[in-house]
């Protein structure tokens, strides 16, 4: 059975992907910050917390990545700031999360012992 890390797993795409992969027999770990902007009701978190290993953390934080990649075979990196309009005036934050977090992931994978064999990256239109 494969271990899959999904960043942004409590978002719309991540939530639906998580359910599908669990149905197919995968072990899922989610790394998500549960941003109030996206997850005001936390309904997806409530549905996922008992069927996944759920890490409430930040994809811009090295320690959260190091914790999340432990024993993973695949990373599906969906975490991103969303909203094209907001990305036009909150440039630093969007760049930090949507580009910087991916760089952080690659740095952690390159410089630590891990079992990750595949990365799937889905980007936001707000990059």
Language model regions located:
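N-terminal Rossmann-like NAD(P)+-binding domain of SDR-like oxidoreductases, especially those catalyzing
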Residues: 1-127
